[in-house]
UniProtKB/Swiss-Prot annotation:
Coiled coil: none
Origin: domain of life: Eukaryota
Job of this protein: Aerial growth, conidiation, and dispersal of filamentous fungi in the environment rely upon a capability of their secreting small amphipathic proteins called hydrophobins (HPBs) with low sequence identity. Class I can self-assemble into an outermost layer of rodlet bundles on aerial cell surfaces, conferring cellular hydrophobicity that supports fungal growth, development and dispersal; whereas Class II form highly ordered films at water-air interfaces through intermolecular interactions but contribute nothing to the rodlet structure.
Stored InterPro entries: Hydrophobin
Organism: Pholiota nameko
Keywords of this entry: Cell wall, Disulfide bond, Secreted, Signal
UniProt-recorded name of the protein: Class I hydrophobin 2
Pfam families: Hydrophobin
Intrachain disulfide bonds: C29-C89, C36-C83, C37-C70, C90-C103
GO cellular component: extracellular region; fungal-type cell wall
Keyword field contains Methyltransferase: no
Subunit record text: Self-assembles to form functional amyloid fibrils called rodlets. Self-assembly into fibrillar rodlets occurs spontaneously at hydrophobic:hydrophilic interfaces and the rodlets further associate laterally to form amphipathic monolayers.
Signal peptide as annotated in the record: 1-19
Length: 110
């Protein structure tokens, strides 16, 4: 009886190993720049509309997430740069750190 249970267990290991293959998100910023933002807002939020108005930027074609009050994160650990707010990868324009467009939150473990 033990031999039968052991053989079932051994034969089922390859099946269990292949059943756990999942795509992994690596949270890297391959396009754009890594920014540390105080908050991330929807491009349709009232705060973003006010900031864009103050900057004189048309919000017509803006979609996705927008980082608010952002500063660039350079090489991690070299200059002591840390981000205690929201690290994001931004592919769009940055307007002197006020906002950054095309942002996606990332986990950089800073």
């Amino acid at each position: 009886m033990f031999a039968r249970a052991a053989s079932v267990f051994v034969l089922s290991l390859p099946i269990l190993a292949t059943a756990n293959v999942l795509p992994r998100q690596d949270n890297q910023c391959n396009t754009g720049s890594l920014q540390c933002c105080s908050s991330v807002q929807s491009s349709s939020s009232s705060l973003v509309a006010i900031l864009l108005g103050l900057l004189g930027v048309a919000a017509g074609g803006l979609t996705g997430q927008v980082g608010v009050t952002c500063s660039p994160i350079t090489v991690i650990g070299v200059s002591g740069t840390s981000c205690s707010e929201q690290p994001v990868c931004c592919t769009g324009n940055t307007f002197n750190g006020v906002i950054a467009t095309g942002c996606t939150p990332v986990n950089v473990n800073l």
